[in-house]
């Protein structure tokens, strides 16, 4: 463990002290690498309901993408037992940026969580529901003809958005799993039988929410002059109410030349598919109702997907020097964190929405890892809205998990 460190920016002489400060502690340690994953699902909370256990992966190497079928160890960090690392399972569907799409089941967040896995023999992807009390997989969501896996759990539970990770591994490796079976038609840039699916976690039933063919048609209607590039999905995000989904339709990431990078929204019943001309940069995050947090120009903005207008701003460009960073809103909606890179470090700005007070953290070493093996800032809140899990390199050069804790000075 490292010592606790104050992490506030300097306060000018004569100025009032910040109403809160930040403390940093190292959660995991050792010769192995430990990490959680990224913020590709909204309200992604690494802690279970009681706050005792934190989910993580343990791996041997961080300087390369995993080999096809290479396993990562799934671990629990017991915060009541000196952060003991407890191995419980393995997954063969993971990568260094996103992990394995961990998400505690909102309907049983004390003991159950989702993760992605692949069949060792067939390479087909699927999602697992695991119970830490029973120490067993209590359900696997398999679709053998057209395998897909979790790409975003509904924040209130009951469903997850499912994606074809084989297609993503082909079209943008950093978001896929190497060697996963790809069932989509390589010669069809926008197949009608692939896209975003919704899986009912209770029944296991699956339906196609929106197809790539529908997205391609919408792009043409909106007069996006792009070549017929194969489309894929990134950042499939349920809103807090569970009635809207925001996502990016993309293409051309594995080649030189023009790209497609267009935001869409759709109601969770499959209606109101909307192609947005206002691009929200970075990793978007849902605020209240129909509001999405992202970047427009130098500003951290609130964009209303229903009115298709910018509805407000958070802070200023001085507070958020890179509004296109990784962003996350606390579970109660009162706190916001923006993680951004400078050189070989990740920094975090913690912002209180009620009064605009903010504090910037010290830098977390991310090394020179880049591209598919980069260490993104990826901040993730706890359930009590006073701590954030972040990645970084420890003194021995291993990738570890750190906690930024908010301390009141009032």
What are these regions (language model features)?
Residues 91-106, 115-195, 209-225:
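Asp-box/WD-like beta-propeller blade repeats and closely related beta-sheet repeat scaffolds
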Residues 57-71, 115-119, 162-193, 248-260, ...:
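Short, conserved, GDST-rich strand-edge loop motifs in beta-rich repeat architectures
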Residues 44-54, 94-120, 149-159, 163-164, ...:
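Blade-terminus and WD-like Trp-Asp/Gly-His loop motifs, strongest in beta-propeller folds
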Residues 299, 317-357:
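Loop/turn-rich, solvent-exposed surfaces of beta-rich toroidal or solenoidal domains
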Residues 277-282, 315-327, 357-380:
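Conserved blade-ending motifs and adjacent loop-strand segments that build the rim/top face
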Residues 39-43, 61, 67-119, 125, ...:
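Blade-loop segments of beta-propeller domains
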Residues 26-72, 236:
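Beta-strand-rich domains and repeat architectures in extracellular enzymes and scaffolds
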Residues 25-37, 87-96, 144-145, 206-228, ...:
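Surface-exposed loop and turn segments in beta-propeller and other repeat-based domains
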């Amino acid at each position: 463990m490292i010592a606790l460190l104050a992490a506030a920016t300097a306060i000018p002489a004569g100025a009032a002290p910040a109403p809160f400060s930040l403390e940093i502690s190292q959660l995991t340690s050792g010769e192995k690498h430990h990490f959680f994953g990224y913020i590709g699902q909204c309200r992604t909370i690494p802690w279970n309901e009681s706050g005792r256990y934190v989910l993580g992966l343990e791996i041997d190497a961080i300087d390369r993408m995993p080999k096809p079928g290479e396993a990562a160890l799934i671990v629990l960090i017991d915060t009541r037992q000196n952060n003991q690392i407890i191995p419980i399972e393995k997954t063969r569907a993971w990568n260094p940026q996103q992990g394995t799409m961990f998400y505690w089941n909102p309907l049983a967040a004390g003991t159950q969580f989702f993760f992605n896995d692949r069949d060792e023999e067939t390479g087909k992807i699927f999602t697992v529901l695991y119970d830490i009390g029973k120490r067993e997989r209590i359900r696997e969501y398999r679709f053998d003809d057209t395998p897909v896996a979790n790409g975003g759990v509904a924040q209130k539970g009951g469903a997850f958005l499912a994606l074809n990770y084989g297609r993503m591994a082909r079209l943008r490796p950093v978001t896929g799993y190497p060697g996963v079976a790809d069932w989509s038609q390589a010669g069809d840039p926008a197949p009608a039988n692939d896209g975003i699916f919704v899986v009912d976690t209770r029944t296991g039933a699956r339906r196609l929410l929106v197809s790539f063919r529908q997205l391609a048609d919408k792009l043409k209607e909106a007069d996006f002059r792009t070549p017929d590039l194969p489309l894929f999905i990134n950042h499939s995000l349920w809103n807090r109410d569970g009635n809207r989904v925001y996502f990016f339709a993309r293409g051309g990431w594995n080649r030189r030349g023009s790209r497609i990078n267009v935001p869409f929204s759709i109601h969770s019943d499959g209606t109101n598919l909307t192609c947005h001309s206002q691009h929200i940069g970075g990793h978007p995050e849902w605020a209240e109702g129909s509001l999405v947090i992202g970047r427009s120009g130098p500003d951290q903005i609130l964009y209303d997907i229903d009115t298709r207008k910018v509805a407000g701003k958070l802070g200023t460009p001085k507070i958020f020097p890179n509004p296109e960073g990784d962003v996350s809103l606390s579970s109660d909606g009162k706190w916001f964190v923006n993680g951004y890179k400078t050189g070989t470090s990740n920094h975090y700005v913690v912002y209180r929405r009620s009064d605009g007070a903010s504090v910037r953290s010290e830098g977390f070493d991310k090394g020179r890892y880049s591209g598919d093996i980069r260490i993104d800032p990826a901040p993730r809140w706890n359930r009590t809205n006073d701590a954030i899990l972040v990645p970084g390199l420890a003194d021995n050069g291993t990738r570890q998990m750190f906690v930024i804790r908010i301390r009141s000075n009032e």
